[in-house]
């Protein structure tokens, strides 16, 4: 291995060809779909949850790299991409809304995240905000509006766990520990838009280290109405979110 290789992603700095912006979905299967909307897409590597492609926007290189689910694997992807020269990160995901007025198919742009994770504590104390970069947020909002997407901008709750941390009772035990009982109602009262599992780690890492990061998610379910999303709705919502993140990347290059 050359000295420029990183531990997990299977990449060298030369693979990036000078790219400074990365789009980071959680799902490895989403990477190729994103890269296909750009020019000259090429697969670079795939190892565990990390699948990486390179493509071009207006002649400039862009990296698309999956992070897997949750903060720990996200922190690995962000760290190693930063070592290789990435300075701007745009996360794209799907999400469950918790505000009644947010509809399935809407788009959420995160300005900051409630730090319900543990990984972000390895980068900054809890008092440090998990806040998105202003330029990234602006680019995502403008990109969403450019395709006519109904867009909401605000705070996201970012949890280590999908079930108890998001106060889900449709589980094997049906039990949620005392710490999280009633938590969703509190977040709703504070205007929190949604739950997901990566943004607290991403935003804390980047804000505390001089990197730029933004977050956009398509709403696949509203948890005030139901818990399980519709497969066709998921596909359509994902398609809109992918177009938005690519257009935002173009505006930031």
Swiss-Prot record:
Pfam entry (one):
PNP_UDP_1
| GO annotation, biological process | DNA damage response; UMP catabolic process; UMP salvage; uridine catabolic process
Signal sequence interval, chain numbering: none
Q: From the UniProt record, list the reaction(s) this protein catalyses.
A: uridine + phosphate = alpha-D-ribose 1-phosphate + uracil
- Could you list this entry's UniProt keywords, alphabetically sorted: Cytoplasm, Glycosyltransferase, Transferase
Q: Name one GO molecular function term.
A: ATP binding
The main location is cytoplasm
Instruction: Give the record's pathway.
Output: Pyrimidine metabolism; UMP biosynthesis via salvage pathway; uracil from uridine (phosphorylase route): step 1/1
- The enzyme's E.C. designation: 2.4.2.3
Whom does it interact with, and what assembly results?
Answer: Homohexamer.
Briefly, what is this protein's role?
Answer: Catalyzes the reversible phosphorylytic cleavage of uridine to uracil and ribose-1-phosphate. Shows weak activity towards deoxyuridine and thymidine. The produced molecules are then utilized as carbon and energy sources or in the rescue of pyrimidine bases for nucleotide synthesis.
PANTHER family xrefs: FI09636P-RELATED, URIDINE PHOSPHORYLASE
User: Which named protein is this?
Assistant: Uridine phosphorylase
Organism field: Escherichia coli (strain K12)
* Gene giving rise to this polypeptide: udp
């Amino acid at each position: 291995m050359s000295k420029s290789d990183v531990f997990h992603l299977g990449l060298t700095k030369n693979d990036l060809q000078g790219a400074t912006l990365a789009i980071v979905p959680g799902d490895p299967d989403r990477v190729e779909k994103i890269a296909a909307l750009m020019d000259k897409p090429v697969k670079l590597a795939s190892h565990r949850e990390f699948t990486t492609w390179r493509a071009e926007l207006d002649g400039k290189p862009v990296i698309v790299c999956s992070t897997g689910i949750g903060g720990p694997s996200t922190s690995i992807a962000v760290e190693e991409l930063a070592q290789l020269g990435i300075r701007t990160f745009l996360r794209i995901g799907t999400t469950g809304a918790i505000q009644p007025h947010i509809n399935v198919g809407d788009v959420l742009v995160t300005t900051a995240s409630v730090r319900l994770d543990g990984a972000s504590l390895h980068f900054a104390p809890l008092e440090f905000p998990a806040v998105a970069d202003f330029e990234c947020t602006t680019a995502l909002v403008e990109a969403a509006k450019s395709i006519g997407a109904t867009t909401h901008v605000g705070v996201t709750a970012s949890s280590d766990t999908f079930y108890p941390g998001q106060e889900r009772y449709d589980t094997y035990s049906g039990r949620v520990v005392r710490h999280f009982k009633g938590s969703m109602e509190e977040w709703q009262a504070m205007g929190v838009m949604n739950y997901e599992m990566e943004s607290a780690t991403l935003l804390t890492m980047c804000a505390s280290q001089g990197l730029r990061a933004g977050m956009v998610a398509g709403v696949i379910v509203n948890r005030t109405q139901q818990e399980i999303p519709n497969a066709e709705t998921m596909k359509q919502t994902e398609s809109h979110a992918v177009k938005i993140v690519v257009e935002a990347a173009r505006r930031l290059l």
